[in-house]
Amino acid sequence: MSQQASGAQVITNSGHDDMIHDAVLDYYGRRLATCSSDRTIKIFEIDGDSQRLTETLKGHDGAVWCVSWAHPKYGNILASAGYDGKVFIWRELNGAWSRIYDFALHKASVNVVSWAPHEAGCLLACASSDGSVSVLEFKDNSTWDYVIFPAHGLGVNSVSWAPATSPGSIVSSKPGPKATGNRRFVTGGSDNTLKIWAYDPATNTYKMEREPLTGHTDWVRDVAWSPTVLQKSYIASASQDGTVRIWTSDPANPLAWNCKVLHFDSALWRVSWSLSGNVLAVSGSDNKVTLWKENLKGEWECVKTIEE
């Protein structure tokens, strides 16, 4: 969801020559990165109601599907991924952008890249149509390490990290696990399932935490793990089957996930939580965005509809 509190800002001249697939504000809301089928990434400086194109990044050999900013504690770093199966890491230093790392081991389109919460380290998860997920890690000695593993045989469409802090840990007397011990994320695939993965230090890879979450009857297009760290864990999943499923887990039994289903009249593409984790935005092929909140009875209500 946008980090701007009020109003919508429209960039009428994006500079792109083809369809735009992603547009993401940085942590401070001062820079906007966009990517397109024209194979480029563009960086805009945002100042109040005005914006200025400052850089065009080139290097991908096909459509660029996704861009994602790292946390500013790691510098001005941007990841991009595209149809060419490549993941690029870009860095801006003293006003100049450069490509500091290329990852090209995926055998098909890389659909989504997602940075982990900064407390867990400088980690980037990448979801690919080749059925695998890779996790890139920037090490203290300025080198990059990676793991890559099969996730969904028919292709991986989405990935979302869990909060670095476990639910309930900030309100309980005993401390939560160390940040690196909570390296967990959820993936959504073309096999209609969600899978939750946890880092295993003994093997230096990620293993499925439990059996897949099932119920969708078509591709899972997006997953979003709520950033809230209060009483429960929440995961939202959006599917081409016209439903959003909201999965909840209690800290007392973290491997058990309950599900509530929201029904829509169209295929769904994206789900996104607010920064506080209590509002869910849903968008699909009907060109609407709906906002949902959980009421005191535990039911989900649509509180706003935004139409183009």
UniProtKB/Swiss-Prot annotation:
Repeat (WD) residue spans along the chain: 15-54, 59-100, 105-146, 151-207, 215-257, 263-302
Location of this chain's protein in the cell: Nucleus, Nuclear pore complex
PROSITE patterns to which the protein is assigned, alphabetical: WD_REPEATS_2 (PS50082), WD_REPEATS_REGION (PS50294)
SUPFAM superfamilies reported for this sequence: WD40 repeat-like
One GO term describing the cellular component: nuclear pore outer ring
GO molecular function: structural molecule activity
GO biological process terms, semicolon-separated: COPII-coated vesicle budding; mRNA transport; positive regulation of TOR signaling; protein exit from endoplasmic reticulum; protein import into nucleus
Assembly and interaction partners: The COPII coat is composed of at least 5 proteins: the SEC23/24 complex, the SEC13/31 complex, and the protein SAR1. Component of the nuclear pore complex (NPC). NPC constitutes the exclusive means of nucleocytoplasmic transport. NPCs allow the passive diffusion of ions and small molecules and the active, nuclear transport receptor-mediated bidirectional transport of macromolecules such as proteins, RNAs, ribonucleoparticles (RNPs), and ribosomal subunits across the nuclear envelope. Due to its 8-fold rotational symmetry, all subunits are present with 8 copies or multiples thereof.
Family membership noted in the UniProt record: Belongs to the WD repeat SEC13 family.
Function, as annotated: Component of the coat protein complex II (COPII) which promotes the formation of transport vesicles from the endoplasmic reticulum (ER). The coat has two main functions, the physical deformation of the endoplasmic reticulum membrane into vesicles and the selection of cargo molecules. It also functions as a component of the nuclear pore complex (NPC). NPC components, collectively referred to as nucleoporins (NUPs), can play the role of both NPC structural components and of docking or interaction partners for transiently associated nuclear transport factors.
Name used for this protein in its record: Protein transport protein SEC13
Organism whose genome encodes this protein: Chaetomium thermophilum (strain DSM 1495 / CBS 144.50 / IMI 039719)
